[in-house]
UniProtKB/Swiss-Prot annotation:
It comes from Mycobacterium tuberculosis (strain ATCC 25177 / H37Ra). Belongs to the UPF0232 family. This is UPF0232 protein MRA_0004. Pfam families: DciA. Residues 1-75, 168-187 are annotated as: Disordered. PANTHER family: UPF0232 PROTEIN SCO3875. Residues 1-17, 24-45 have a biased composition (Basic and acidic residues).
Amino acid sequence: MTGSVDRPDQNRGERSMKSPGLDLVRRTLDEARAAARARGQDAGRGRVASVASGRVAGRRRSWSGPGPDIRDPQPLGKAARELAKKRGWSVRVAEGMVLGQWSAVVGHQIAEHARPTALNDGVLSVIAESTAWATQLRIMQAQLLAKIAAAVGNDVVRSLKITGPAAPSWRKGPRHIAGRGPRDTYG
């Protein structure tokens, strides 16, 4: 090791411009480069050399070639289906598809007169706009289940609960108990 660190009295004017910390860093870097060259590694000037030469250090880029490759762009729908399958979301996606794409699943004519409200445990609740449409949907329930199974898969919807328009009621919720019965309202 050479330099002005061993002999502080030499080159005082030059040392005043350079700090001893920078000199120590430069010596350490030079020693690391020399050790890298001794191991047979590239001991360039770091990022400055790679930017100046125009290529990034490391493995060269290889092109995929003319055939299909895993790195080729994939359709978004296919990627989403594969992600749902890997994560176990397929059933939930199919349930959402029944509710979200109702008109595409059952047809526009039925979708104009009936709408799904909930899908719980394989039971799809559907509200028809009139009692006539509710009756018609109950008659064609098997065909509706077949259409839904063809669109989203088997065992997503196992049965339908079809109701007509709601009449005025003071009951809240699907279950209830009998009230107090008729009362004397004429005080």
